[in-house]
Amino acid sequence: MNLTLKVWRQKNATSRGHLTTYRVKEISPDMSFLEMLDVLNERLILDGDDPIAFDHDCREGICGMCGLVINGVPHGEQRATTTCQLHMRHFKDGDTIVIEPWRAAPFPVVKDLVVDRSAFDRIIEAGGYVSVPTGSAPDAHAVPVPKASADTAFDAATCIGCGACVAACPNGSASLFTAAKITHLGLLPQGQPERARRARAMVETADELGFGGCTNIGECTAVCPKGIPLATIARMNADYLGLAATGD
Amino acid sequence: MSTEFYRTGAPIEDGKAPDGVIAERWDNRRFAAKLVNPANKRKLTVIVVGTGLAGGSAAATLAELGYDVKSFCYQDSPRRAHSIAAQGGINAAKNYRGDGDSVHRLFYDTVKGGDFRSRESNVYRLAQVSVEIIDQCVAQGVPFAREYGGLLDTRSFGGAQVSRTFYARGQTGQQLLLGAYQAMARQIQAGKIEMHPRTEMLDLILVDGRARGVVTRDLVTGEVRNHFADAVVLASGGYGNVFFLSTNAKGCNVTAIWRAHRKGALFANPCYTQIHPTCIPVSGDHQSKLTLMSESLRNDGRVWVPLTGGDTRAPADIPEAERDYYLERIYPSFGNLVPRDIASRAAKNVCDEGRGVGPGGLGVYLDFADAIARLGRDAVAAKYGNLFEMYERITGEDPFETPMRIYPAVHYTMGGLWVDYDLQATIPGLFVIGEANFSDHGANRLGASALMQGLADGYFVLPNTIGDYLAAGPFEPLDDAHPEVADAAEAVRTRVAKLLAVNGSRTPDSFHRELGRIMWDYCGMERTDAGLRKAVGLIQALREEFWRDVLVSGESEELNQQLEKAGRIADFFELAELMCIDALHRTESCGGHFRGESQTPDGEALRDDETFSYVAAWEYTGDRPVLHREHLTFEYVKPSQRSYK
Amino acid sequence: MIDRGAATAPVQAPDQGAGRARTERTTATKGSRATTRYRGAVGKKAVMAVTGALMIGFLVLHMIGNLKVFAGRDSFNDYAAWLRTVGEPMLPPSGFLWIQRIGLLVILALHITAAVQLTVQAKRARPVKYHVKRRVQQSYASRTMRWGGVIIAAFVVYHILDLTVGVANPAGTAADPYTRLVADFQRWYLVVAYAVPLLLLGLHLRHGVWSAAQSLGRGGTARERPIKLFATGFAVVLVAGFLLAPVGVLVGVVK
Ligand SMILES: Cc1cc2nc3c(=O)[nH]c(=O)nc-3n(C[C@H](O)[C@H](O)[C@H](O)COP(=O)(O)OP(=O)(O)OC[C@H]3O[C@@H](n4cnc5c(N)ncnc54)[C@H](O)[C@@H]3O)c2cc1C
Ligand code: HEM
Ligand code: HEM
Ligand code: SF4
Ligand code: F3S
Ligand code: FES
């Protein structure tokens, strides 16, 4: 199939960007979205143009490195799918596709479609861990964890840190990402001693980094490739406010 | 042949390997190792390249011990290292099930699984430490699967006869890596780790023969910079991407260890490559990488191809009598659960016979119809739902309706830099951990053992052994002006400039694809003398063309993904040649290395313990590599021919 | 704010690192627990939720009080008078009303302040807009919270001038409450002037009630649907209850 792409091009963080139109031909429906961009890039190089920079690594939906806003939706319209897993069979011949980078002040554009998401690392560094030195752990069976808690903690722990939640949120809020980690650790017995401190430090760090606040709009969970539920945000709020969370 | 492709040097020995009763060796070594005074640890700096399971766990633990750590990764966050993609699980000899597992059995299985090409002492230590890994990870909050009683669940994996594999749904690597990443985050916050994401190591700095630092390129600004330390740890992962198509992440590369190899570190067993049988087949020329489908699918799926070649009917239209369930036919006792290398080769054989299915005839069916009929659709969905979904996303076909198509793909590289029992390479002060070293797995790795090894190295082994070396430090302070430092940095700048200056007519990817094709055809699942000789010639010619005709767009002082690629490919060329030479010299079949000339009458791999019971450690010379042999002895596990019939 | 290249800049030098600075910040936060909490977006949202809930409480009582118009002129006027005498002699005349007015003003001020601060924070977080932005699942109600709130506030000002003070009322300041009310709603355009903000209020609460539960950590995957259903039901009942009086007047049930 043949497609028209409008791609955000920006030489570096300080220069002004703009949308540039490209036409790509003979795209196979079996290609992934990124493979389609590979094809375009190969052509751009041979034409002496600068290929489009975009982040990616695992190309199987787990590393969280890829992420493009495709026709206005982070990771594209297919639900629970990362950009690298999105395949061209979901597009039609003749379609126009607009491709933009994540937009948020704490995610400055580095080049073209590449943004700097290190703010997420700062949030985890603020407290997204259990302080346990190596080698001092009790036997793994010393503390049983009810299956239900373990499973819910796991659901939250599957966050890949891609940042689509921020990109989608009209407030540019990192709440879903932050809440996913707070929920993961807060539900396990191992995470209890630091639970209150963790929530406070992580939430405040997110604010300081310039993310917006959550007004419970729910776009984040809709685009989240791992379907992290809004319940995690409720749990984060409860932990932050020092209230006992209810529900799962 | 020796003179044609390589030379033979003096044999080497693992000087740090303790002797005595195997179960006490690790204790003995730890006791014999020198300790570093706590006050001195603050004055010592360690560089850790890589933030995967191995590098992440090592950096966190070293920082905790008090060393100053500098960490590097090429991704935008340490959390994205390729370990994140591991699906199946991690082995540990916990024997929580009481099904007869023990440290000794894990040791035994690993030595046997490695086809008797690994060191007994190392493997025993790995099995011992495995137990502590699970404790450590659980304490960090890694959400392993649990049973209703709240205790950890385990499963049997990769044909093991005991249930020793701990898992976190199909995302074990992710959860373990996040555990290590969080431990790192804690140390970054505490100011003990200086993290450098989007920074690639491009050379090793040697001063007076010791590893004293790395030269890096900042992938955003292009700045080439020196970083100094008292010891350097490489944890840069595997090099399966030399095949272009593999299950590895796109950025996986050999650069870090290859640069160290060029500076004198021996490279061991480069040819041992694990080909995983259950991957989604290539769908066209555009294919950029291959996706693994967890091995656990073979527990319930049945593998088959049409009985006769050229059968293009839809799978549902092929009657039972005209199907060949070839694994069940050839290996009646293990059936669909034969080890990876056997399943992979069998698939290749039926496809070579022209009986493969799907585009290009490179695929076999993995059929769940029986399982669905037997267990019900819901039960199958509960077990494999996420994998089916992943398959559906990629292929657009629903495995509930039509059989999956699978084909083998390059997955893991057992080879890597040679290290001694302390995980130190032949360059003093250079330590290598995780998939980047060659240790522990011999000629073939068992499922769920790579995660175990990475974490064993990083959390428990290296932090103990590196002290023995560092006790002699701190070493003299260095600066950019030091002649050996300046030379290293200059070499990096020159190389970057050279890549950009070629300005030819072919893209880096086109070279990489072609190189991968050569490797897959001649150094892939089956290797022959003639094929390997041909491959060496082809690789040399292609490499020469690369340096004459590659077109790297852009400049060096910016984010330039083509430049990154080109640099990695340049190193892959050199590695590829060494892999072929290693494969050529090893005229036996063992583990992940199958030589067409060395098989039993019924087509199974035939080892030659008499001649090849050694680690092949190669020295870089710039011309023909020099082979150093480290002989292997087996006191506890008697080498035997594997049989899965 | 993060500047360019932060991803590659060394996170910190080991001795004067940002990591250290951050640790200090989190351990050395000054001020009482409540004020520290309020600094974060989550704290602001909690304030909005609590103030919102209090305002909802007022509206429920107000709505029920309004239904007295159906009991006749005297009953309604008595009720209005009672509001001014309740609590006497413990409270001065209209004491209760003034307490309520001050209370509501403070509550509204807090609610609006937090709303404005959150809006500013959100605008700063997304300085560059998308060229194309598609909504995936956000509701109309959730998107109209800010403008809806402003319109509701404007309405309240008008409403007080109309029915409490009387200057904006067709019947004027001298008329009794019942007369003013009837004077209003005999005019269809004033019914519309009330109905529109009321519908917006309904939307505000449809999202607000669920949102408040979420903000206070009362959400949960299993509860999301029930709470949302309740919120919708509640908003419908409240708006309908308020609309009874104007519609009653318009169709002539109340004269
Ligand atoms: C799809 C898949 C599934 C797997 N499933 C399993 C499983 O179920 N069980 C199991 O035991 N094993 C599994 N494995 C194998 C296992 O995941 C890997 O062997 C293991 O994770 C390697 O860890 P590592 O820490 O050595 O390296 P990696 O995780 O690969 O990390 C390498 C690190 O080095 C950095 N790096 C690399 N080069 C440079 C450079 N030049 N400069 C700076 N930094 C650099 C990278 O940024 C990265 O941080 C699987 C592998 C794959 C591909
Ligand atoms: C000037 C007037 C008002 C403004 C500007 C305003 C604005 C807002 C905003 C921006 C929100 C947050 C949006 C969200 O949660 O998605 C909100 C929430 C809310 N508002 Fe209002 N509002 C106003 C008046 C009112 C009134 C009169 C009521 C009560 C009846 C009310 C009840 C609520 C409730 C219950 C919430 C939910 C709180 C939460 O999400 O935590 N608001 N309002
Ligand atoms: C049709 C709907 C409504 C009717 C008929 C109505 C009627 C009245 C009347 C008659 C009064 C004057 C009472 C008195 O002075 O004794 C009043 C006061 C008031 N109403 Fe309403 N009202 C309606 C809707 C609303 C709404 C939607 C709000 C808020 C969002 C609101 C907020 C107030 C306030 C704040 C006062 C002032 C109370 C005081 O004097 O302190 N009303 N209303
Ligand atoms: S919560 Fe979802 S969208 Fe946000 S970073 Fe995690 S995986 Fe991505
Ligand atoms: S979209 Fe934004 S407002 Fe909250 S619920 Fe999600 S973070
Ligand atoms: S590239 Fe790893 S998630 Fe898309």
Task: Give residue ranges: language-model regions.
Chain A
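Eukaryote-biased recognition of intrinsically disordered, low-complexity regulatory segments
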Residues: M1-Y22
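Glycine-rich phosphate/adenylate-binding loop and adjacent beta-alpha elements
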Residues: I70-K92, I99
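Short, structured protein-protein interaction patches enriched in aromatics and acidic/basic residues
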Residues: A53-M65
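Short strand-turn-strand beta-turns centered on an Asx-Gly dipeptide
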Residues: W8, V24-K25, I70-G72
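Ferredoxin-type iron-sulfur electron-transfer modules in oxidoreductases and energy-metabolism complexes
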Residues: M31-D50, D95-D248
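Short, contiguous acidic and Ser/Thr-rich linear segments
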Residues: T20-S32
